[in-house]
Every structure is written in structure tokens, then in C-alpha cells.
């Protein structure tokens, strides 16, 4: 029995026969940030990190995508899922949060930003493919990390990971994370976790983008290919 290929949500099914059946899958797939994203809270701020690969099916559409999206001066989000969906949600939240800040005449809270993401992702949960991590700093609570996975749930965590590559590093982050880590330790922790995920996950790759957010502001850096941590694979000696 001939198998019927079903394309991603929002696109037409791929034909089972004819000239179009042999067309590359990226012609029928939506752009996805397949991805590995991460955020860690430290005393005085947060660190965010993400890979930079965007895929359309098996085709790498962009090698240097910026998945760390600014929502306000000291609030960022990490995006995973459909690139179109996550960009649209991030733009809408940025717009709403900007007006909220103007009305209050003060910087918005990180919790407020996360709640806006949660509300939108839950309301349109049947239509969106978006997993988002919100992290930032505000004067009331300091550094905070919130996770809004697909479906619209919101939970605050000391650290959060997401995306297709996250399944490869749950053991590493659980074993390595500890309370009281410094900013530098969190940056190294995030870089190591992302590098491990990028080695195993075909939808994660490119460069590593990092951001440290604290009261003074945002510090961003990019780890290029020769700067990404390398992990050797043990091999048995020849017999």
C-alpha cells in the first residue's frame, strides 16, 4: 500500500505519485527553528543561549538565525517551533508590552511578558507551533526564567531548555546545574549544553548566540565554529 506523506501543519499534503512526488521536501515544508534553546538564572540576572540553524524540511534555510529576540530593554525570549508563528507571537507581545510600559511609565515585569506569551499561546494553541522561553531582569524580582511550551502552560524555573535538541541534554543539565552559579559559570554551562545538543541533533547547528541580562543591561556574544566547545567521543583501542 502506497504511503501518503503528510507535510507540516499549514501546508498541502505532499503527493504520493507524479512529478511533484520527487520534489525536495523543503518545497512543501514551512520554515522551522528546529533548534535548541536555553536560559539559566543566576544571582543578579539571567543567561540565554540558542543555536542558529533554521530548517525547511531537510534543507538548512539559514545557518546564522538569531533566535534570541528582544521583547523589552531587559527582557528577551528564545524561540523554537515554526519560525513564522514564533516571530508573529513575539512581535505581538513586544507591541503590547511597549504600550503597557508607557501606561505605567516604568519598565515592565518579566512575569508580565511571560503572561502575555502564555495568554496568546494558550488562546491559539490549536493553530500555533511555538515553544518559547522568556527570561530577563526587573527591579522587583531580579533575574527570572519562564517556560511556555506548546499548549500555553507557563512555569517559572531556575533554568529551562527547549527545542528538538533539548531531549539530548536533559541528563547533562540536571547533573551539572547547581544553585548559586555565577554569570561566567552560567555562560559556560549554557555553551556546553548547546554544543552537546548541536552534535547530536540534526535540526540544531550553526553558531551559538549568548546573552547575559542584568541591571546594567544586556551583554551579547557569538561563539563561531572554532570557538564552540568540543567533546571527544571515547573509542576503544584497536585489538
From Swiss-Prot:
Active-site residue list: 35
GO biological process: proteasome-mediated ubiquitin-dependent protein catabolic process
Domain of life: Eukaryota
Cell compartment(s), UniProt: Cytoplasm; Nucleus
Subunit-structure text: The 26S proteasome consists of a 20S proteasome core and two 19S regulatory subunits. The 20S proteasome core is a barrel-shaped complex made of 28 subunits that are arranged in four stacked rings. The two outer rings are each formed by seven alpha subunits, and the two inner rings are formed by seven beta subunits. The proteolytic activity is exerted by three beta-subunits PSMB5, PSMB6 and PSMB7.
Protein's name in the database: Proteasome subunit beta type-6
Modified residues (N-acetylalanine): 2
Family (UniProt): Belongs to the peptidase T1B family.
